[in-house]
């Protein structure tokens, strides 16, 4: 999922099943070594780049490694293959252990001539502008296709008293959730797996410059038959820290909900009700969705995700994208371009008045704690019985 993020955006302290997208840096195609064009004067500052990790991490995500020391400067310099001696001659300090760390994390490769080259995509402003132009064009078409389904979806949620969750469910469950599952099932996007070859993380990690004015992502944590998903932005995450301090209560909430339709643990109610996850009697005030087509919300989500996946398969020219941007294969092409489409599609739906951005995403500074639940939902696996 964004899919976009910053490591540590985990609801569980012992999160072992996250699919994310971390946003904070950038990655790809400027073949200039370091300086770049005048409009890219901020690109050398990693914090001014948007970094996205669509990945399965082991214990951390690669954006954290990029942020250490001068690793970002090294990655920028090694877009052109360079030896350590050449880096030294450019006045770019580095150690062999630093280079080994970057290799271990799959961020650079060593060539046969003992030169190091960046192995991830760093998109400069020109490439980012072209990519986002493709995204806007395809998003315009996609919104035209799914608009009737979105209208019906919002009505369905409103019928169940969940209209305030429409934005985050459309983003985190449908477009940044089940659509990926559909694409993986169809073999259009590579499934992620931690292996001996990829022990730290598996998936895609890239950066873009400049950042979007607004972007959000999804973090998902699973424990047993329950998963909790958070639709986050960087500023919203900071605002929600008081809730995350009570994250130790979430497994106990799961335990109660596995036995009943309400939470009975008084400490859980006291700790989570102020943030809009349960009411004073322990009834969930956030969506609890069974991952089963007998659940009407899940069925509608799954159907719309299929429509989106089919659209991407028929409208995205991955061959042309590989030539233009240097993507390694069709899977990477879809992952990177569709991540841009995620925000463009939701922005268009929001502009059309079909969905409304939750307060904690729209205006984090003034959002009330009881509104935090609007960006959170639970899913329950089919093995619940």
Segments from the language model and where they lie:
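Boundary at the C-terminal end of the N-terminal hydrophobic targeting segment
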Residues: 36-38
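Short, amphipathic alpha-helical interaction segments positioned at domain boundaries
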Residues: 120-154, 290-322
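Short alpha-helical segments that sit at the start of domains
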Residues: 41-72, 208-249
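Short capping segments at the starts of secondary-structure elements
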Residues: 79-87, 247-263
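Minor-groove-contacting beta-hairpin "wing" of winged helix-turn-helix DNA-binding domains
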Residues: 114-119, 282-289
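Extended alpha-helical scaffolding regions
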Residues: 132-231
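Short amphipathic alpha-helical interaction segments
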Residues: 89-105, 110, 260-275
